[in-house]
Amino acid sequence: MMTHLRPALASLLALSLLTGVAYPLALTGIAAVIAPDRAAGSLILREGQVVGSALIGQGFDGPGYLHPRPSASDWNAAGTSASNLGPTSAALLAEVQERQAAYEAQNGAPAPVDAVTASGSGLDPHVSPANARAQAARIARARGLDEAAVRRLIEAHVEPPLLGLWGQARVNVLAVNLALDAAGA
């Protein structure tokens, strides 16, 4: 029995060290060399303080800020999740209708799909350009800014699809809100 057990335990230990320690450390080291910002979490700093991550959404609900997509996990990265409500769920329909009515009342514009539906992770840091543009008038009113200036700021933060092929154009909510704060008012 020991003749079979000893090689099995040695293999288990060796593979555990290889896949549980060596491989993750090697990938972390490679990432730190190739893309140090992303390896560190794409943190955004203001005056030496971390204000957020370009990759993790956070809630903004003031009228002078660009609002993110709804989140089933209240933007909690430790408890990220979707709502688990299916497409035929009456509860999901009621949530979407409630979000749509609130969005249209706040912004005076039709609600784009991403304004009323949560992302799968609940932490999406981006909204669609259409969603951001629809919020421009509300943001301008709340901040006492010219709507055209807010629209220009939003357009300056539109990120194209990856290599022009994959994904969709998107706007990082935190980046726009920090730019709005930097613009004053």
UniProtKB/Swiss-Prot annotation:
Membrane topology: Single-pass membrane protein
Organism domain of life: Bacteria
Keywords: ATP-binding, Cell inner membrane, Cell membrane, Ion transport, Membrane, Nucleotide-binding, Potassium, Potassium transport, Transmembrane, Transmembrane helix, Transport
InterPro entries the UniProt entry points to: KdpC (IPR003820)
GO MF term (any one): P-type potassium transmembrane transporter activity
Protein's UniProt keywords contain Ion transport: yes
Transmembrane intervals: 14-34
GO annotations of cellular component type: plasma membrane
Subcellular location: Cell inner membrane
Family of this protein: Belongs to the KdpC family.
Job description of the protein: Part of the high-affinity ATP-driven potassium transport (or Kdp) system, which catalyzes the hydrolysis of ATP coupled with the electrogenic transport of potassium into the cytoplasm. This subunit acts as a catalytic chaperone that increases the ATP-binding affinity of the ATP-hydrolyzing subunit KdpB by the formation of a transient KdpB/KdpC/ATP ternary complex.
Subunit structure: The system is composed of three essential subunits: KdpA, KdpB and KdpC.
HAMAP family from the UniProt entry: KdpC (MF_00276)
Protein name from the UniProt record: Potassium-transporting ATPase KdpC subunit
Provenance organism: Cereibacter sphaeroides (strain ATCC 17029 / ATH 2.4.9)
Lineage, top ranks: Bacteria, Pseudomonadati, Pseudomonadota, Alphaproteobacteria, Rhodobacterales
